[in-house]
Amino acid sequence: MVDLTHQVLPQSIAEGSYYLQQSVTQFPRGTVFLAVVDPGVGSSRKAIAATAGGYFFVAPDNGLLSEVLSQLGGLEEAVELELPADASNTFHGRDVFAPAAGKLAAGAELSRLGRTLPDLVASTGRTTIFREGQLEVTVLTIDHFGNVIFDFPARRGWEQLQPGNKFLIRGKRITFWPTYSRVLLGESLLLWNSSEYLELAVRNGNAAEEWGVKVGERVLIEALW
């Protein structure tokens, strides 16, 4: 059993989705992922178990799995988990999700855990907006170093993001480079992080503090011609 993280901000479905997406392929097929970011606990949202790409997932049906399922080629099968009569109204992670994950890890068939679902709730809040020479993104997460990761993977493509090109963020100029070492200590830059997501960083510094941004905020990046 591997404990991936407990550092996802409370109720931040998008941040939880990002970490799940980055982690899944580091594990062998057949791995069961228990993922609980559940601001809707006790509501009508479904508790689910699903499979894609040879992996299994147990989670609330609130969009948390959307990105990782898409990454793995799409949903293959999903079921709605039944709530035990004595389940807490506020702690489904303990009373619903964890037991289901344990059953899957012990070899239970997914189809025996509940009734089949044709589809799942799609994620919301990770919408990138393109305009002429502009990119509006959301802060997905801020890592231990204070690096700011945006909801924009390299595969989406934006031709302006080339080494040496300059941009404007909140009135400040910044340059896109491939590595931290291309700038002086304390200087900011844009780059692709190790997961190929757009990152705002400060060399040997804390970009989140320097730029005053928080998880969930929208940020406008303007290309300077």
Give names to the regions the model predicted:
Residues 88-151, 156-161:
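Anionic-ligand-binding alpha/beta catalytic cores of soluble enzymes and soluble regulatory domains
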Residues 25-29, 41-42, 49-52, 72, ...:
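Solvent-exposed alpha-helices and their adjacent loops that cap or buttress functional pockets
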Residues 1-2, 31-34, 47-49, 54-58, ...:
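Structural motif
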Residues 25, 29, 70-74, 102-110, ...:
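Generic secondary-structure signature for well-ordered alpha-helical cores
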Residues 215-223:
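Surface-exposed interaction regions enriched in Ser/Thr/Asp/Glu
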Residues 4-6, 36-39, 52-53, 60-62, ...:
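Fold-independent oxyanion-binding glycine-rich loops
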Residues 3, 7-22, 26-37, 42-95:
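Active-site histidine-anchored catalytic micro-motif
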Residues 149-212:
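A conserved acidic, glycine/proline-rich C-terminal tail/linker
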